[in-house]
From Swiss-Prot:
Organism: Methanobrevibacter smithii (strain ATCC 35061 / DSM 861 / OCM 144 / PS)
Any one GO biological process: translation
Name of the protein this chain belongs to: Large ribosomal subunit protein uL4
Annotated keywords: Ribonucleoprotein, Ribosomal protein, RNA-binding, rRNA-binding
Protein family: Belongs to the universal ribosomal protein uL4 family.
Region described as Disordered: 45-70
PANTHER family reported for this sequence: 60S RIBOSOMAL PROTEIN L4
Quaternary organization: Part of the 50S ribosomal subunit.
Function: One of the primary rRNA binding proteins, this protein initially binds near the 5'-end of the 23S rRNA. It is important during the early stages of 50S assembly. It makes multiple contacts with different domains of the 23S rRNA in the assembled 50S subunit and ribosome.
């Protein structure tokens, strides 16, 4: 498979042969597992206090009193300790020692990344994911390495406009909305839309230049993962590769 390399002005500079990773088999099931594995690896353990509801000297009266044989507090008849009692323990409490991480085999994870990279070259998948492609002739977009040294938002805005992906950044900006439900009070007030992903051979300042654009993520090719390529487990993210990143991809994730 061949692809054009664009300059920062949006003009075709040359044509290169894409590595075999872009022809990998499409496996949405593996991609989903790899993304969920990455998400659950960040989960903070939570659980109830093991002593909750048990801090009492309640003791049962036994039979023969015409009342339920449940533990009752001393100097009174109020039930305690048991799950059905007010202030009693929980029947099956959450436990902090539970491991929430859903693991995945190393070879499967690498296969998932390769498959997600190949999905970025499928125009139909990228469109179905909701990205605005406009007049784009090819996906993924490959740009010259000079972009790695761009350090300002103004410059990156002009480059994205020249490459034809700024409409998708606008979509991400307009898609920010307040979350429904209790999550608003738990540090995740807004739901945000993912825009283009920029994969670079090395970071010489481009992260500073692109971080202020809504929905844009920047990553070096060595740190590429399934969650960046398929946010929310949905493959086909609009992706911009630098030429050096494409060259390095051929020897990674094997």
């Amino acid at each position: 498979m061949k692809a054009n390399v664009y300059s920062m002005e949006g003009e075709v500079k040359e044509e290169i042969e894409l590595p075999a990773i872009f022809n990998e088999e499409y496996r949405p099931d593996l991609i989903k597992r790899a993304v969920i594995s990455a998400q659950t690896a960040r989960v903070q353990p939570w659980g109830n206090d093991p002593e909750a509801g048990k801090r009492t000297s309640a003791k049962g009266w036994g039979s023969g009193r015409g009342t339920a044989r449940v533990p009752r507090i001393k100097n009174g008849s109020k039930a305690a300790f048991v799950p059905m009692a007010v202030g009693g323990r929980r029947a099956h409490p959450t436990r902090a020692e539970k491991n929430h991480h859903e693991k995945i085999n190393i070879k499967e994870r690498r296969f998932a990344i390769r498959s997600a990279v190949a999905a970025t070259a499928n125009k139909e998948l990228v469109e179905n994911r909701g990205h605005r492609l406009g007049d784009l002739e090819q996906v993924p977009i490959i740009v010259e390495d000079d972009i790695c040294s761009v350090k300002t938002t103004k410059q990156t805005r002009e480059i994205f406009q020249n490459l034809g992906v700024y409409d998708d950044i606008t979509r991400a900006k307009e898609g920010k909305r307040i979350r429904a439900g209790r999550g608003k009070t738990r540090g995740r007030k807004y739901k945000k839309v993912k825009g283009p992903l920029l994969v670079v051979g090395e970071d010489n300042g481009i992260k500073l230049g692109a971080r202020n654009h809504a929905g844009v993520d920047v990553v070096t090719v060595e740190n590429l993962n399934a969650e960046l390529l398929a946010p929310g487990t949905h493959p086909g993210r609009l992706t911009i590769f630098t030429k050096s990143a494409v060259e390095k991809l051929g020897g990674l994730f094997q």
